[in-house]
C-alpha cells in the first residue's frame, strides 16, 4: 500500500473515530460524516486514475452528489432541531416523531 492510500485510509479512520467518539452534538457528527465522504471521494478518484478504469469515471461525481444530498438533509435537520429545542444535541433526535 502506498503512502497516498495509507494517508487517505487514515483520514477515513480518523473521521470514523470522531463520529463514534463525539456523538453529543449534531454539527460535529455532520462534520465527521463530511470528512468520511471527502476521504472516500479522494480514494475513489485516485484509484480510478491509477488503474485507468474508463467505465468508472463518473463514480466520484455520483459520490459527490450523494454527499451534497446528505449535507443538505443534515443541515435542514440541524436547523429544525435547533429551532425547535434550542440546542443541537443528538439526544433530541429521539424526541422527533412523525
Swiss-Prot record:
Gene3D superfamilies: 1.10.287.3510
Keyword set includes Metal-binding: no
Transmembrane segments: 1-21, 29-49, 61-81
Localization per record: Mitochondrion inner membrane
Pfam families named in the record: Oxidored_q2 (PF00420)
Record membrane topology: Multi-pass membrane protein
GO biological process: ATP synthesis coupled electron transport
Catalyzed chemical reaction(s): a ubiquinone + NADH + 5 H(+)(in) = a ubiquinol + NAD(+) + 4 H(+)(out)
Coiled-coil stretches: none
Major localization class: mitochondrion
GO molecular function, one term: NADH dehydrogenase (ubiquinone) activity
Keywords carried by this UniProt record: Electron transport, Membrane, Mitochondrion, Mitochondrion inner membrane, NAD, Respiratory chain, Translocase, Transmembrane, Transmembrane helix, Transport, Ubiquinone
EC annotation from Swiss-Prot or TrEMBL: 7.1.1.2
Top EC class, one word: translocase
Family matches, as InterPro entries: NADH_UbQ_OxRdtase_chain4L/K, NUOK/Mnh_C1-like
GO cellular component: mitochondrial inner membrane; respiratory chain complex I
Family: Belongs to the complex I subunit 4L family.
Quaternary organization: Core subunit of respiratory chain NADH dehydrogenase (Complex I) which is composed of 45 different subunits.
Purpose: Core subunit of the mitochondrial membrane respiratory chain NADH dehydrogenase (Complex I) which catalyzes electron transfer from NADH through the respiratory chain, using ubiquinone as an electron acceptor. Part of the enzyme membrane arm which is embedded in the lipid bilayer and involved in proton translocation.
Protein name (record): NADH-ubiquinone oxidoreductase chain 4L
Organism (species): Phoca fasciata
Gene that this polypeptide is encoded by: MT-ND4L
